[in-house]
């Protein structure tokens, strides 16, 4: 039996980040539903991002399910390697 559930996706971002725009676009092209948390508008959320990402301060910070993907470069690399669809539950 195939698992058809899709993992929860969270992207921590800011309103001025071009890499956030690229990550958002890639996830949207994949048809992924995700939550976007703007850390420039909420310091408590920024602190949560820092804790969850192991102290990484750059944005975006992307999580697919329990997996910390990292930023846009890592997300793009997963897509090019054919792994992103699998992580999104689409493979």
How should each PLM-predicted stretch be described?
Residues 38-57, 83-91:
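Thioredoxin-like thiol-disulfide oxidoreductase module
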Residues 22-24, 30-31, 51, 77, ...:
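Non-catalytic interaction surface on structured domains
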Residues 2-13, 51, 81-82, 88-91:
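C-terminal alpha-helical interaction module
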Residues 54-63, 73:
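Structural micro-motif
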Residues 2-33:
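Local sequence-structure signature of Cys/Sec-based thiol-disulfide redox active-site neighborhoods
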Residues 64-90:
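Non-catalytic, surface beta->alpha helical segment in thiol-disulfide oxidoreductase systems
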């Amino acid at each position: 039996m195939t698992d058809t559930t899709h993992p929860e996706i969270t992207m921590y971002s800011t309103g001025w980040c071009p890499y956030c725009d690229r990550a958002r676009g890639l996830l949207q092209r994949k048809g992924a539903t995700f939550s976007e948390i703007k850390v420039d508008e909420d310091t408590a959320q920024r602190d949560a991002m820092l804790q969850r990402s192991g102290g990484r301060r750059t944005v975006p910070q992307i999580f697919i399910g329990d997996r910390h993907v990292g930023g846009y470069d890592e997300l793009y690399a997963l897509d090019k390697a054919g792994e992103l669809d699998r992580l999104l539950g689409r493979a």
